[in-house]
Amino acid sequence: MSSVPEPSAALLQRAVAVRRAAVDLGQTDDGQRALALQAMADALTERAATILAANREDLERSAGEGLAPALMARLKLDDTKLAAAIDGVRKVASLSDPLGCRQLHRELDQGLVLERVSVPLGVVGVIFEARPDAVMQIASLAIRSGNGALLKGGSEARCTNEAVMDALQAGLAASPVSADALALLTTRQESLALLRLDGLVDLIIPRGSNELVRFIQDNTRIPVLGHADGVCHLYVDAAADIAKAVRVAVDSKSQYPAACNAIETLLVHRSIAQPFLAAALPAFAAAGVKLRGDAESVALGVAEAATEEDWSTEYLDLILAVKLVDDLEAATDHIRSYGSRHTEVILTEDAQTADRFLAAVDSAGVYHNCSSRFADGFRYGFGAEVGISTQTLPPRGPVGLEGLVTYRYRLRGEGHITADYANGSCVFTHIDRPL
């Protein structure tokens, strides 16, 4: 961690303020947190023109600096995108309270009762790149789950992020929740020093490039939730419905290619390759997708030859690698070798083949006959997502409120002592009670 600076006194002061506000926030009730979220949404609506003007400034500056097209797409915030993000804040307000949920209720002995109850994590630190809508998503989930949040967006979106945070804090100031529960970090030094705030920050969630995520994972003692790559695959089986497969494949790549849940490699069963590609090539061309294929797919019309590097590349662009495979096992072997355990899709009308794929592929999301783009917290009904995790341990996949809470054991007794159980004068009953 030699490359990570020590936190400044100013950063420590802000982190302590967020921590203190989080303690109070964790003790608010469901109604108070819902009111806070509605106030945040109202403030965002009132300041929409200011936020969009700030975003235009960011876009103009970033275009002049030569920001990559994929990042420009993520950076852009228009009326529709902003309205959807604000609606997402209101939807989070209407979600069931994730706190105080009793997960275990057990009588250990008469008068000695154990409960396991959901509680906030405390403070989350979120580092993300050119995604100004992420500020609204993360802040709403943090407040709903009773957590404070330190947020650091990419410098590309600095004007937008500041305008959004001003609105969010104004909303909190008019609510039962302290505005100190949210803080925006604005410099690279602060984002690096955040990694040293173990003791004040309970979880770090990186949202961005492979390099960003891996750097954070390698340079902090704080637990990290996230994924480093989004190399997603779609396999067209021999028993696929060609018209359906073309429609789903094109959507999975082109609906929003800069997203981590867009497919990067198309695997096609050799026996269906000729008729499928005959239908798919013009559809991909119409969507602006450039294909890079193995020798066999090039022979069937794919314009450009793929290299070994293409199989492991997250393009985040209108580029798709294509490979023909012998069977389901060859497809799943390729996915295991090159995939990032994010989201994988099979297109087939054979239910048994689909079940084998869903069981064999160890990714956070495995889909049958639908677009990979459904891998999203909002589409899952989570209201929004704080990030996507490809780790094996939970939370996994799109992470909503449930990923921002932990649990606490509460034991209530009447003067019970362990010595009475050690000498046999008392005996555990271990009777489960209704939740």
From Swiss-Prot:
GO molecular function terms listed in the Swiss-Prot or TrEMBL record: glutamate-5-semialdehyde dehydrogenase activity; NADP binding
EC number(s) given by UniProt: 1.2.1.41
Enzyme class, broadest EC rank: oxidoreductase
Pathway: Amino-acid biosynthesis; L-proline biosynthesis; L-glutamate 5-semialdehyde from L-glutamate: step 2/2
One GO location term (cellular component): cytoplasm
InterPro entries noted in UniProt: Ald_DH/histidinol_DH, Ald_DH_C, Ald_DH_N, Aldehyde_DH_dom, G-glutamylP_reductase_CS, Glu-5-SA_DH, GPR_dom
Pfam families per the UniProt record, alphabetical: Aldedh
Localization per record: Cytoplasm
Primary location: cytoplasm
Domain of life: Bacteria
GO-annotated biological processes: L-proline biosynthetic process
Catalytic activity: L-glutamate 5-semialdehyde + phosphate + NADP(+) = L-glutamyl 5-phosphate + NADPH + H(+)
Assigned keywords, A-Z: Amino-acid biosynthesis, Cytoplasm, NADP, Oxidoreductase, Proline biosynthesis
HAMAP family: ProA
Role summary: Catalyzes the NADPH-dependent reduction of L-glutamate 5-phosphate into L-glutamate 5-semialdehyde and phosphate. The product spontaneously undergoes cyclization to form 1-pyrroline-5-carboxylate.
Similarity section: Belongs to the gamma-glutamyl phosphate reductase family.
NCBIfam families reported for this sequence: PRK00197.1, proA
PANTHER family named among the record's database cross-references: DELTA-1-PYRROLINE-5-CARBOXYLATE SYNTHASE (PTHR11063:SF8), GLUTAMATE SEMIALDEHYDE DEHYDROGENASE (PTHR11063)
Name used for this protein in its record: Gamma-glutamyl phosphate reductase
Highest classification ranks of the organism: Bacteria, Bacillati, Cyanobacteriota, Cyanophyceae, Synechococcales
Gene: proA
